[in-house]
């Protein structure tokens, strides 16, 4: 179920403040965030965020195509090692 239009996109308040500080300073540093649920806004384009995946911060460079998506979509939390090999085939 999609979010209601009258509510607008969800973004944590501290995230807006951090992004504004980096824009004012003109620095190109990675902004560490823990809010995977926040929506990417147009004012975040060009910035790099370190999105926490449960163990480390994954750098995510925001571009125009990402606007409207959530930060968590670009920082996978699970590692896929592939399906287990067939034990019968290994013995031969």
Curated annotation (Swiss-Prot):
Q: Which UniProt keywords apply?
A: Ribonucleoprotein, Ribosomal protein, RNA-binding, rRNA-binding
Q: Which InterPro entries does the UniProt record give?
A: Ribosomal_uS19, Ribosomal_uS19_bac-type, Ribosomal_uS19_CS, Ribosomal_uS19_SF
Q: Name one GO biological process term.
A: ribosomal small subunit assembly
Molecular function (GO) terms for this protein are:
rRNA binding; structural constituent of ribosome
Q: Which GO terms describe its cellular component?
A: cytoplasm; small ribosomal subunit
Top-level taxon: Bacteria
Q: What does this protein do?
A: Protein S19 forms a complex with S13 that binds strongly to the 16S ribosomal RNA.
What family classification does the UniProt entry report for this protein? Belongs to the universal ribosomal protein uS19 family.
- Recorded protein name is Small ribosomal subunit protein uS19
């Amino acid at each position: 179920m999609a979010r209601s239009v009258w509510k607008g996109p969800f973004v944590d308040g501290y995230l807006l403040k951090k992004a504004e500080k980096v824009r004012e300073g003109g620095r190109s540093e990675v902004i560490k965030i823990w809010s995977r649920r926040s929506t990417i806004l147009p004012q975040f384009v060009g910035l790099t965020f370190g999105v926490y995946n449960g163990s480390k911060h994954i750098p995510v460079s925001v571009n125009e195509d990402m606007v409207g998506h959530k930060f968590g979509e670009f920082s996978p939390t699970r590692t896929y090692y592939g399906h287990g090999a067939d034990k019968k085939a290994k013995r031969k």
